Regions:
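Charged catalytic and DNA/RNA-contacting regions of genome-maintenance
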Residues: 1-331, 347-360, 364-456, 820-829, ...
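ATPase nucleotide-binding head domains, primarily ABC-like/P-loop NTPase cores
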Residues: 35-38, 230, 300-301, 311, ...
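Active-site phosphate-binding and catalytic loops of NTP-dependent enzymes
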Residues: 87, 110-119, 251, 389-393, ...
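Conserved catalytic alpha/beta cores of large enzymes that bind or transform nucleotide phosphates
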Residues: 164, 169-177, 183-186, 198, ...
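Amphipathic heptad-repeat alpha-helical coiled-coil/stalk segments that mediate oligomerization
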Residues: 204-212, 219, 267-271, 283, ...
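Amphipathic alpha-helical coiled-coil segments
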Residues: 322, 329, 339-345, 372, ...
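Charged, surface-exposed helical/loop "interaction arms" that form contiguous linear patches used
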Residues: 361, 365, 375-378, 431-432, ...
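C-terminal tails and terminal domains of large nucleic-acid-associated
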Residues: 837-879
Length: 879
């Protein structure tokens, strides 16, 4: 690199170490990028691409960003999936001998961004590490901004995707084996918007992982961390920690606890079900408004909002834990005044979790400390109010909550009420906190007064009436005495300069004043910065206490929110059972009732059990409310996260997982048709559901022909109803009225329909679920409601009358039920299983016969094309 300038050589050496990053290289007041980085950044950020002399004949492509505006540009690059290495000047350019020393102080990636402006305060920003070894997946998840750190293991790709969907990380790092395992990496990148990298093999050595973990958490064995049974997970946790060390360039003190967890502790909700039930965002707009979380979230703090989201995404399956949460909600609603006082005290609390991370990273500014102080000032009254409650969970929250009064007092004494953002501009430390600060501050403001006082004192003391204190840049401050008073100059005056008509002197006292006055500004700024850093370090040393307190505040915020929602919306406390009974009286959909006038929502009952009410077949027209009814039952996730539920009363049998098959759409990205997507989801449900699961199946089989669809739907119901094969509790909505014939043939299947009132050709949807099967689909009436032209409606009525002669219900009545035996079924020879065409009454029999007689094997390609063209013209001309 001899041809490059010294500065460019330094840049290229640094870039060589961080090849996979965009290098932000600090030059004075700018971060500059060169060569490929400059071209990429100028394009993505729409910056002007210029050139810089680098020692070669051609100028190096270059673009720059002002250092004071870097966050906005940086966040945009990171949001686009880039890694950015920040290379700072690590010595004062004024003191540098030769080239200023520079070092990369941090690497910012999508999963490690700490900028509060870039992060959604109500959502964690997770980074996930996946290790694939011996058909198992080790999974470790961290939120660097809050210090959360989790680890688990799963044994299938589907379970892995459930974890990915649950945590929704913005970045995944993995070993090469996972990258090459056949997992759809592009799907992760593009559909789920996740940045994913495969790291070098050495990151995933088990010895390195173990050493990294034991050293960081200061323990002597994996047992102490709860990782003894997590061989694969331990490697993932160690590799992730190593990666964070390398990107964050600090000791990661905010990651103080690791949480191993078993996926069996929570209800399993796969990605399809999460989307269909709209737990945290709506299916189409991807917005919070309209989701279950939107209804429940009355939290006052960012920490509470994040914790509530995790509760919604991870419902419990342990009865005691669920009831423990219910007890907290119950008691909060028994003390409404105290509950509202708690909300008032929670309201001013800032994001303590992310604030303490900034403190431990030494990036917290003075205003962050003021926000921290105003937050922890709320803790003593909150803890005092919690003393009024008796339930176990609120007692645990009170126990975990530290009032942190000494930290509040420290900040109160030390930091100005309205300090600047910058730590280098002074104005940080309060008067009275430090003697030297007070002295320098006084020198800065009262220096002229001190000089005038000294001048008067020396004039009186010496009798030199024209003695003056003056200043120049060469000598600083000095005493000037004219020659006429030279004889009165005392011995302690030290001559500095002789002029034609006067002498210039200094004294020890004047020199001391000079040092204080001239250096006061710089010394004050430096001292204030040092004192601020001391205060910040004192707070950082208490990170474990602060994080535990933050979690307690978040938990309180969640339960106060759930209590308020239950109170305002007339929710009831569900009785949790382990015998499989789901008995909901007057159930309502929590979201729909909020989106419309509450008085307009029609409530409904639901009863399912492990005996004769295992499956409910629900029939009725579109728009009648079948899907809303089924989804509101599925939202028993509310009960298992510990919340009250929208119903008059509810008994909820714990379910281990919920599956939904709702709606239909092509998966164009993977080349799958609507029907293939549907069948993939059905296959997943039948293979992974258990007898303790809840299934919500809407219109199984509608993506194919009538007979095929009916046959599949029928067989699916038979499979689910058989306790030896599955036996899961199921709500099964269908347009195939023929499935109502299963009631009576299968002793655990029951028919329900949506009540409809007919007024001539018009219909009124009553939105009420009643016993029995629907005998009509009312499709034409729904089409009329939708505004389909009258001519089309009239023609549809004619066609449906003709088609009704081909009723397949009679066929369904004669189908034998699969009981699981090996006995051969009777053939239904009299049934034509050909797809029933909409226009069976006007078949083109001659064209079909001609097509049947074509000898395809002996046609040339051009003859085949001509024959196809001929047949097509016949069809066109006929219609």
């Amino acid at each position: 690199m001899a041809e490059f300038t010294p500065m460019m050589q330094q840049y290229l050496q640094t870039k060589e170490e961080y090849k996979d990053c965009i290098l932000f290289y600090r030059l004075g007041d700018f971060y500059e990028m060169f060569f490929e980085d400059a071209e990429l950044v100028s394009k993505e950020l729409e910056l002007t691409l210029t050139g810089k002399n680098c020692g070669m004949e051609e100028r190096a492509p270059m673009c720059g960003i002002p250092y004071h505006a870097v966050e906005g540009y940086l966040n945009k690059l990171v949001a686009n999936g880039h890694k950015v290495a920040i290379c700072e000047q690590v010595e004062d350019p004024k003191l540098a001998k030769g080239l200023v020393r520079r070092e990369v102080i941090r690497i910012v990636t999508p999963g490690t961004n700490l900028d509060m402006q870039a992060l959604d305060e109500s959502k964690n920003n997770y980074i996930m590490c996946i290790v694939y070894l011996a058909d198992r997946y080790g999974v470790s998840i961290a939120d660097v901004s809050t210090g959360d750190y989790y680890v688990t293991e799963v044994d299938s790709e589907r379970k892995l995707f459930d974890e990915i969907t649950k945590f929704s990380p913005s970045e995944i790092i993995c070993n090469e084996s996972f990258y090459m395992s056949g997992v759809d990496i592009e799907d992760l990148r593009h559909r789920l918007k996740i940045t994913i990298y495969a790291l070098e093999t050495w990151y995933f050595g088990d010895e390195l992982a173990e050493t990294t973990l034991l050293t960081h958490f200061k323990v002597k064995s994996l047992e102490a961390l709860g990782l003894a049974d997590y061989d694969c997970g331990m490697i993932a946790a160690g590799a992730l920690l190593k990666y964070l060390y390398e990107t964050q360039k600090n000791d990661l003190n905010n990651i103080s606890v690791i949480h191993p967890y078993s996926t069996g502790k929570y209800m399993i909700i796969d990605s399809s079900t999460r989307r269909n039930l709209e737990l945290v965002e709506t299916l189409r707009e991807k917005q919070k408004r309209g989701s279950l979380l939107w209804v429940l979230d009355k939290t006052k703090t960012a920490m509470g909002a994040r914790l509530l989201r995790s509760y919604v995404e991870q419902p419990l399956i342990d009865k005691a834990e669920i009831e423990k949460r219910q007890d907290a909600i119950c008691e909060l609603n028994q003390h409404v005044i105290t509950r509202e006082e708690l909300r008032e005290y929670l309201n001013p609390i800032y994001d303590l979790e992310r604030l303490i991370t900034r403190v431990t990273y030494l990036t917290a500014n003075p205003r962050d400390l003021i926000a921290f102080r105003s937050s922890i000032a709320m803790l003593p009254p909150i803890k005092s109010l919690l003393g009024d409650f008796q339930c176990e969970l609120l007692g645990e929250i009170r126990e975990d909550m530290d009032t942190l009064e000494e930290l509040c007092a420290l900040i109160d004494r030390a930091i100005m009420e309205e300090p600047p953002i910058s730590v280098r501009d002074g104005g940080l430390i309060k008067d009275g906190y430090n003697e030297d600060v007070d002295k320098y501050r006084k020198a800065k403001t009262e220096g002229k007064t001190w000089l005038a006082e000294l001048e008067a004192k020396e004039r009186e003391k010496t009798g030199i009436k024209n003695l003056k204190i003056k200043y120049n840049k060469v000598f600083g401050y000095y005493l000037e005495v004219t020659n006429s008073y030279k004889d009165l100059v005392p011995d302690y005056f030290m001559r500095k300069q002789t002029l034609a008509n006067a002498e210039r002197y200094i004294t020890p006292e004047l020199k001391e004043l000079e040092d204080m006055i001239l250096g006061a500004e710089d010394k004050l700024v430096t001292l204030e910065y040092d004192l601020f850093c001391e205060v910040r370090s004192t707070i950082a040393a208490e990170v474990v206490r602060i994080q535990r307190t933050a979690k307690a505040v978040a938990g309180l915020d969640v339960f106060v929110s759930l209590a308020l929602v239950a109170d305002q919306n007339n929710y009831c406390r569900p009785k949790i059972n382990e015998n499989g009974i789901i008995d909901i009286k007057g159930g309502r959909h929590p979201v729909v009732e909020k989106m419309i006038n509450n008085d307009m929502f029609i409530d409904n009952d639901t009863y399912l059990d492990n005996g004769n009410h295992r499956i409910s077949i629900i029939t009725g027209p579109n728009m009648a409310g079948k899907s809303t009814y089924m989804r509101q039952t599925a939202l028993i996730v509310l009960a298992q996260l510990g919340s009250y539920v929208p119903a008059a009363s509810a008994k909820i049998g714990i379910v281990d997982r919920i599956f939904t098959r709702v709606g239909a759409s092509d998966d164009l990205a993977s080349g799958q048709s609507t029907f293939m997507v549907e069948m993939n989801e059905v296959a997943n449900i039948l293979r992974n559901a258990t007898s303790n699961s809840l299934l919500i199946l809407d219109e199984i089989g509608r993506g194919t022909s009538t007979y095929d669809g009916l046959s599949i739907a029928w067989a699916v119901v038979e499979h689910i109803s058989n306790p030896k094969l599955l036996g899961a509790k199921t709500l099964f909505a269908t347009h195939y009225h023929e499935l109502t014939e299963l009631e009576g043939k299968l002793n655990n299947v029951n028919n329900y329909c949506v009540a409809v009132k007919e007024k001539g050709d018009d219909i009124v949807f009553l939105r009420k679920i009643v016993k029995g099967g629907a005998d009509k689909s009312y499709g034409i009436q729904v089409a009329k409601l939708a505004g389909v032209p009258d001519s089309v409606i009239a023609r549809a009525k004619e066609i449906v009358e003709e088609l009704s002669a081909n009723d397949i219900t009679e066929v369904a009545r004669n189908i034998s039920v699969d009981t699981g035996s090996k006995k051969k079924k009777e053939k239904l020879d009299e049934v034509d299983l050909t797809q029933m065409s909409l226009f069976d009454t006007v078949r083109d029999d001659d064209i079909i016969e001609e097509l049947r007689n074509v000898d395809v094997g002996n046609l040339t390609p051009i003859e085949a094309l001509n024959k196809l063209y001929e047949l097509q013209n016949k069809v066109k001309n006929r219609w």
